[in-house]
Amino acid sequence: MIIFNISALGPPKPMLQFVGRELVETSRATMLRLPIDSAMHPFSTLPNHELGLYIMWMMSAVFVIFKLLAPAKCDIPTVNGRRRFEIGQYQARRRFSVDGRGIILNGLQMARVFRVVSQKGPKIILGPEYANEVKSHPACNADVFIAKEFHAHVSGFEVLRPQQVMKDAIRLRLTRSIGALMKPISAETALILESQWGNSNCWHELDLNFTIASLVSRVSAVMFVGEELGRDQKWLSIVTNYSSDMFVADLDLCKWPEALRPIATYFLPSCGKLRRHIREAALMLYPILSEGYSAHQNKQNFLDWLEEIAGDRKYNPVLAQLSLAAAAIDTTSDLIIKTLTDICRFRDSQKLQEDLREEMVRVLRADGWEKSAMYNLKLLDSVLKETQRVKPVVVFGMGRYVTEQITLHDGTVISKGETINVVNTRIWDPAVYPNPLEWDPYRFVRRRDSGDHAAHLVSPTPDHMGFGLGKHSCPGRFFAATKIKIILCHILLKYDVKIPDEEISTVISSGNFLFPDSTLRISVRRRQDNLTIWD
């Protein structure tokens, strides 16, 4: 059952609700209870903004005073707490923003369980030895963590609310349809590269972050909503901007006490952008959903899979699409950008590129665009996993909300209501990976050839949690890995690539994150491949 509200898109109109494929009117009182409704309510209708702001600031002051006077929790040490003469956590948060990775690594030298004051507030950090214990503990809830960490109860952030229908659609439809999607992914990639990268055999520069994000967002959108909407620049702008704007809005909202965030969201321009993106996405999906997606396009897609899987369960297709896009675009783009820069800056880049091309041609000629080809691209798989190891998206992950007091295997007690994360630092441990700071593109080929089944990109372990761990590991990782490999096959077989400025850092550390440098550029020129493997 599809439900979404388009009531705030203009002058007052009857409320509209999808029940199956039928659009019916419903009362405003009913719609106020729907998940999307809070994103459609402009706070500007409240009578007195100045009074509201005054009340909020007074409540904030009371909250801050209460927190300052409250006794500090001292059972678990804090490694970057307040220093002498500091009031509040502002400076501690700022220090974490500048050197989060260093603070985490230093903390692990002091204790295996400790607190940090992050940009998003205090949290408990566990060493990697706790990963297997935490991943399946019934009192460690991942969905509640995501909802609390990303304000899913706050207007504009509804996209982060858990939707089991979407998880089921990914697991039962998307993953099982990878084989059928490979040729469409390849065809769309070819179209985009020809239009954006061109066919010139002369070197020319491109903004690496922009061009990869554009490519990934369109390929993903075409797979998720079909060719017509997936190629629409307005739709692509909505889904890509929602993700980037959410990161900014998240940090803005974290500056407010948690209890006041549902109110503060209406005064923050960054949060207003999120509500606008949701409204615009609803407007664009409305014609397709009202007509019936299969009637609109002559083949099934993720919209249809959601409807099939949902059955009588209620879900919101707008939130589902924005959530899917946020998960698919950022992490996929991140890994492609980092991998390309690692390939270009490898000490013997030319040989590595030729080795990759030789493997791609051999495998694709033998298997074509089939799932077996993705399995047999061993060197490409190794290159991707090595980049994810050396330059992960985050230093700590496996976020969990503790729903009741737990005692870990070593006697450590974690209280109910705490937020915990497990660090991914074994990826830099010389006892696990010799020369861990060296990017070795052949590392996981050797491990795989020696019988290490965990050497595959999509195989998460406590030693390499790039896709999480356990039942909450990324459900879309198989689709993401396939999409990334197809895109890189097109890029490396069709273009010579190099990074023009050797002095620019490839990764910027900010808090828990390792971002690709936003100023990175890539030089490309068309190769004369004359290959016949693209059909």
Swiss-Prot record:
Its EC number is 1.-.-.-. Pathway: Secondary metabolite biosynthesis; terpenoid biosynthesis. Heme binds at C474. Its cofactor is heme. It is a single-pass membrane protein. This is Cytochrome P450 monooxygenase ausR. GO terms for biological process: secondary metabolic process; terpenoid biosynthetic process. CDD domains: CYP503A1-like. It is an enzyme of class 1 (oxidoreductase). Signal peptide: none annotated. The chain crosses the membrane at residues 51-71. The keyword Ribosomal protein does not apply. Keywords: Heme, Iron, Membrane, Metal-binding, Monooxygenase, Oxidoreductase, Transmembrane, Transmembrane helix. Cytochrome P450 monooxygenase; part of the gene cluster B that mediates the biosynthesis of austinol and dehydroaustinol, two fungal meroterpenoids. The first step of the pathway is the synthesis of 3,5-dimethylorsellinic acid by the polyketide synthase ausA. 3,5-dimethylorsellinic acid is then prenylated by the polyprenyl transferase ausN. Further epoxidation by the FAD-dependent monooxygenase ausM and cyclization by the probable terpene cyclase ausL lead to the formation of protoaustinoid A. SUPFAM superfamilies: Cytochrome P450. The lineage of its organism: Eukaryota, Fungi, Dikarya, Ascomycota, Pezizomycotina. It comes from Emericella nidulans (strain FGSC A4 / ATCC 38163 / CBS 112.46 / NRRL 194 / M139). GO terms for molecular function: heme binding; iron ion binding; monooxygenase activity; oxidoreductase activity, acting on paired donors, with incorporation or reduction of molecular oxygen. It is found in: Membrane.
